Amino acid sequence: MNMSVLTLQEYEFEKQFNENEAIQWMQENWKKSFLFSALYAAFIFGGRHLMNKRAKFELRKPLVLWSLTLAVFSIFGALRTGAYMLYILMTKGLKQSVCDQSFYNGPVSKFWAYAFVLSKAPELGDTIFIILRKQKLIFLHWYHHITVLLYSWYSYKDMVAGGGWFMTMNYGVHAVMYSYYALRAAGFRVSRKFAMFITLSQITQMLMGCVINYLVFNWMQHDNDQCYSHFQNIFWSSLMYLSYLVLFCHFFFEAYIGKVKKATKAE
């Protein structure tokens, strides 16, 4: 396995993290993500049915705490994985940053890679607040949560190429997104342009995901040992990112462009 020499400073908890046990656990338990997804789907439909005849819950303080916790986690994750990826990109080049498997077991990043995939299970809790507060639940929201959980657990066990980019981008977008949610939940007035920026960042993330999949597919065929993945993973990843791209573009149009056109016609 290709290990990159890294000179970035490690914190003690990052040094003590046993990535071999983590990878082995995921190889043995990744299919539990299907169980979590099924329970999540059952909660969505069951919870909405139960809340039909009930008054909504405010849950403002718990929502602030929840969003703030995920924001802080994502900020730290983005800083640590971002530092690693930047180091590899500048010292080894683009191909190594995409193909290097040491993101999963190297210093600094190994802890945050595992923390990332595990976090996709508790992040399902976002939907609890939407259900209990009787807010609009769109398809993109729960589809995104389920598929990210399934794909993250499925991919981590194989340590496939491209994972470093996928995780770092997601950390970065979530750092901004959950900070925005925390501010909104706390009652701060946040510019509409900030929300537009977040959605554009998500669209950019999905475009980059498609590009990374193309690069992995291309490099894998020339040297699978140096850029390890498999066609099944690339197929599911490409399908996932393409579907996200379409859905986020549709959401952007409906939420920002479509509303402006309707408001203009009304005037």
UniProtKB/Swiss-Prot annotation:
The reaction is stimulated by the presence of HSD17B12, the enzyme catalyzing the second step of the elongation cycle. It is an enzyme of class 2 (transferase). GO terms for molecular function: acyltransferase activity, transferring groups other than amino-acyl groups; fatty acid elongase activity. Keywords: Endoplasmic reticulum, Fatty acid biosynthesis, Fatty acid metabolism, Glycoprotein, Lipid biosynthesis, Lipid metabolism, Membrane, Transferase, Transmembrane, Transmembrane helix. Induction: By SREBF1. N-Glycosylated. Highly expressed in adrenal gland, liver, white adipose tissue (WAT), adult and fetal brain, cerebellum, spinal cord, testis, skin and peripheral nerve; where lipogenesis and steroidogenesis are active. Weakly expressed in kidney, heart, skeletal muscle, lung, and spleen. GO terms for cellular component: endoplasmic reticulum membrane; fatty acid elongase complex. The chain crosses the membrane at residues 34-51, 70-90, 111-131, 136-156, 159-179, 197-217, 234-254. The keyword Lipid biosynthesis applies. It is a multi-pass membrane protein. Glycans are attached at N2. This is Very long chain fatty acid elongase 6. Disruption phenotype: Homozygous knockout mice lacking Elovl6 are partially viable and surviving animals are fertile. Mutant mice appear grossly normal and slightly but significantly leaner than wild-type littermates. Hepatic concentrations of stearate (C18:0) and oleate (C18:1n-9) are lowered, whereas those of palmitate (C16:0) and palmitoleate (C16:1n7) are increased. Elovl6 deletion abrogates the development of diet-induced insulin resistance. It is found in: Endoplasmic reticulum membrane. Its EC number is 2.3.1.199. Optimum pH is 6.5 at 37 degrees Celsius with hexadecanoyl-CoA as substrate. It catalyses: a very-long-chain acyl-CoA + malonyl-CoA + H(+) = a very-long-chain 3-oxoacyl-CoA + CO2 + CoA; hexadecanoyl-CoA + malonyl-CoA + H(+) = 3-oxooctadecanoyl-CoA + CO2 + CoA; (9Z)-hexadecenoyl-CoA + malonyl-CoA + H(+) = 3-oxo-(11Z)-octadecenoyl-CoA + CO2 + CoA; dodecanoyl-CoA + malonyl-CoA + H(+) = 3-oxotetradecanoyl-CoA + CO2 + CoA. Catalyzes the first and rate-limiting reaction of the four reactions that constitute the long-chain fatty acids elongation cycle. This endoplasmic reticulum-bound enzymatic process allows the addition of 2 carbons to the chain of long- and very long-chain fatty acids (VLCFAs) per cycle. Condensing enzyme that elongates fatty acids with 12, 14 and 16 carbons with higher activity toward C16:0 acyl-CoAs. Catalyzes the synthesis of unsaturated C16 long chain fatty acids and, to a lesser extent, C18:0 and those with low desaturation degree. Pathway: Lipid metabolism; fatty acid biosynthesis. Pfam families: ELO. One of its GO terms (biological process) is very long-chain fatty acid biosynthetic process. It comes from Mus musculus (Mouse). Its main location: endoplasmic reticulum. Belongs to the ELO family. ELOVL6 subfamily. The keyword ATP-binding does not apply.
